Regions:
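Bacterial Sec-dependent N-terminal signal peptides
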Residues: 1-20
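Alpha-helical cap/lid subdomain in secreted, periplasmic
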Residues: 19-20, 51, 77-217, 467-559, ...
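Conserved SGNH/GDSL esterase-like catalytic core that processes O-acyl groups on lipids
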Residues: 21-26, 31-120, 299, 305-307, ...
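Short, conserved helix/loop micro-motifs enriched in His/Cys and acidic residues
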Residues: 26, 339, 346-381, 484-493
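Non-catalytic, glycine-rich low-complexity segments
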Residues: 219-247, 298-308, 315, 586-602
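Surface beta-strand/loop "capping" patches
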Residues: 225, 234-237, 574, 581, ...
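Extended acidic/polar, glycine-enriched regions
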Residues: 242-326, 397
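C-terminal beta-sandwich/jelly-roll accessory domains of carbohydrate-active enzymes
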Residues: 259, 611, 617-693
Length: 693
């Protein structure tokens, strides 16, 4: 409707002036001007916009480097010749992109309260100068300012987001159309060589957004790839489906017999929400229509959906595991659907070619995929941990289970965290700086990344191990899809710095919960296995303690099935099933399902002996029937020594009694451990260290 009105308004002068062109004034700063381009007259966003709009429009560039929106700023736009020229030209459409230079400490701290009034005054000046035209005004959210801007942490970062909020308020207050120029560029730092100015490719993205806003052409009806035939819709919660269509288009949806409709917004986005459904074992259909196009999804199941993520031990496939034959022999009778996000190129010991490097920069990292019904081939190539987790859920709950896997070998946890969260974190923001030389990031990750991208000539070349990258390519595209929770197997690429990982992990969980707008979303993870790497005992114990700090978060032990030299143990079925036990007990309320091995509650001195009490065990025993191994004690000043269960200690139900007094107790503290403590369910105890009190 808004474009119909605009067309009618514009039609009057067109009729009178015999096909007079529609004038588009691009008002702005150096980004509009095309600063940094070899030839702005050919590659600036207004020039590219002209090419997109065609001969029916005349686009002019009124950008001036350093211009501020604030009239008391260091270079007010209203005092510049470009402003006067734009007013005199009498445009039909005005696209305003100002505010970046107002983040200067000379401007925003002093005159922020005048921003709203100054912005409104510029808008009204275009209208007042030519009241017969009343030009259409587009207000733009600013393009990004990235972390390597010289003033990023000293104020620019925070003032930038404050200005973005003001701009949004201005658009709402005057019912002006808002164009979000950060929408696509915020995840493309490779297009901003100086952290501020988009290169020609970035300018083309801006031009495309402005083109779509002016013409309402957003490419017609489209949905994220996560929606497809065979998908599993999360039971028990309303199902929201998102997509894009041409602005103002009526979007109609039908989920079986339930109908719903909406209108695509000014930015082309829309969403439809359908009533919550329960699993019923039936096949369902969803149909979406808009812009003369119809998209239908069939064979949809209602059930449980889980995200399965991390690095190579989560990506480790069923066909590589020691349980391959048993896994494939038992796929019948379970309805498990797989959404398997495989990378276009693996982070192997190779140099990637130019095609791969360009694809990574454009976020074309994961191979496009669809939901698949389980069969021998699909299961063979799917994550072994994830599949065994899903199989146990399907058996126990009796409902279809959908598994989304986006794990990437070698990936550090920080690559899965969203950019805004990291940018605003007082410590983790430093991960972003020169990440390929940054010792906050594991040296192996940096070395492998350097090898993979050795052929790139772009100093801002992207890589899956870069902070935020896997969030932008592997989490953001599926964030619209309702899930029950997440399972996570990762840590090998963060084990170099236990204390830093604790901060990263807490931030990761928080990032995902905000992404899915679910502060209590369950997050279950695998504690690292055992291997001859010195830092791993400390890391495993840190993971144990992390689980006690984060609500609705818990871990599964895997140190009992490690390997002294292979970081990829092949025993994956027990790991997936231990994760499933956590979900069944805690999330699904099946409290009879044992979820943990013996867990230390306290250690104290009694009658000259050291007593350790455990929960999650009526009787402590061993996995191999031999004497208990792996327990160590230390005196007040001495080192740790092994406890001999032949002569020094005994097991009494859920207690261990050690002769003499100790000050600290450790268990399974060797990098590769043969510790063998389990409970009556056969579930192993975690690595731990506790103080005797």
């Amino acid at each position: 409707m808004k474009k119909l009105i605009l067309s009618l308004l514009l039609a009057l002068p067109l009729i009178a002036a015999a096909q007079e062109k529609i004038k588009v004034a691009c008002v702005g700063n150096s980004v509009t001007y095309g600063y940094g381009h070899a030839n702005p007259a050919e590659t600036s966003y207004p020039t590219q916009l002209q090419e997109m709009l065609g001969n029916g429009y005349e686009v002019r560039n009124f950008g001036h480097s350093g211009a501020t929106l604030l009239s008391k700023g260091h270079r007010p736009y209203i005092n510049l010749p470009e402003y006067a020229a734009a007013i005199e030209w009498a445009p039909d459409i005005v696209v305003i992109h100002l505010g970046l230079n107002d983040t200067d400490p000379r401007n925003w701290p002093n005159y922020r309260d005048e921003f709203f009034g100054d912005y409104t005054a510029i808008i009204e000046s275009f209208r007042a100068a030519h009241p017969d035209k009343s030009p259409k005004i587009y207000v733009c959210r600013m393009t990004p300012i990235f972390h390597w801007h010289r003033r990023f942490k000293s104020g620019t970062r925070d003032w930038y987001w404050q200005i973005q909020e003001r701009i949004e308020g201005i658009a709402r207050s005057g019912d002006f159309e808002l164009i979000d120029l950060s929408r696509y560029l915020y995840s493309r730092p490779d297009l901003m060589p100086d952290a501020l100015h988009p290169n020609p490719e970035g300018a083309g993205i801006i031009a495309g957004q402005v083109y779509s806003a002016i013409t309402d052409d957003f490419g017609g009806l489209a949905l994220p790839a996560i929606y497809s035939d065979n998908m599993v819709v999360q039971r028990g919660v309303p199902f929201t489906i998102h997509g894009t269509a041409n602005a103002g288009s009526r979007v109609k949806g039908r989920f079986d017999n339930e109908r719903n409709s909406t209108v695509a917004g000014d930015d082309g986005s829309w969403q439809l929400t359908f009533e919550a459904r329960e699993a019923d074992g039936k096949s369902h259909k969803i149909k979406i229509e808009a812009d003369g196009k119809s998209i239908e999804f069939t064979n949809i199941a209602i059930g449980e959906v889980w995200l399965c993520s991390g690095q190579s031990n989560m990506a480790f496939m069923v066909k590589e595991s020691s349980h391959r034959e048993a896994s494939l022999a038992n796929i019948e009778g379970k309805d498990i659907r797989l959404y398997d996000m495989k990378p276009r190129v693996y982070t192997d010991n190779v140099e990637w070619d130019t095609t791969a490097l360009v694809a990574l920069n454009r976020h074309d990292y994961y191979i496009p995929t669809l939901w698949q019904m389980q069969n021998e081939e699909n299961v063979s190539n799917f994550s072994a941990v994830a599949y065994h987790f899903g199989a146990m859920l399907a058996d126990s709950l009796g409902v279809p289970v959908g598994l989304i896997c986006n794990a990437i070998g070698g990936a550090p946890a920080e690559s899965f965290i969203d950019r805004k969260t990291i940018e605003h974190h007082p410590m983790l923001v430093d991960l972003l700086y020169n990440w390929k030389e940054n010792d906050m990031i594991q040296d192996w990750c940096r070395g492998r990344a350097a090898q993979n991208i050795a052929k790139s000539t772009n100093r801002l070349q992207r890589h899956p191990y870069e902070p935020c990258y896997l969030y932008e390519t592997g989490i953001a595209p599926i964030a619209c899809y309702p899930i029950s929770g997440a399972i996570w197997y990762q840590g090998e690429s963060n084990a170099h710095n236990v204390e830093l990982h604790e901060v990263i992990f807490l931030t990761l969980v928080d990032s995902w919960r905000r992404t899915w707008n679910n502060p209590i979303m369950p997050f279950y993870f695998v504690q690292l296995s055992s291997i001859n790497r010195p830092s791993w005992p400390h890391f495993r114990d840190s993971q144990r303690r992390l689980a006690t700090k984060i609500p609705y978060c818990d871990f599964a032990v895997s140190s009992d099935i490690g390997h002294p030299t292979d970081v990829h143990p092949k025993e994956k079925a027990p790991v997936g099933e231990r994760l499933a036990r956590l979900a069944l007990n805690q999330f699904y309320g099946m409290t009879h399902v044992a979820q943990h091995g013996p867990t230390p509650v306290k250690a104290y001195i009694e009658g000259g002996n050291t007593i350790i009490e455990f929960e999650n065990a009526a009787t402590i025993t061993t996995s191999d029937g031999n004497k208990l191994r792996g327990l160590q004690i230390a005196g007040e000043f001495g080192g740790f020594a092994d406890v001999d269960f032949n002569s020094q200690a005994t097991i009494e139900g859920n207690r261990i009694v050690i002769d003499g007094t100790a000050h600290r107790v450790r268990y399974a503290w060797r990098p590769y451990t043969d510790a063998n403590m389990v409970n009556e369910e056969g579930l192993p105890a975690s690595t731990f260290e506790i103080e005797v009190k």
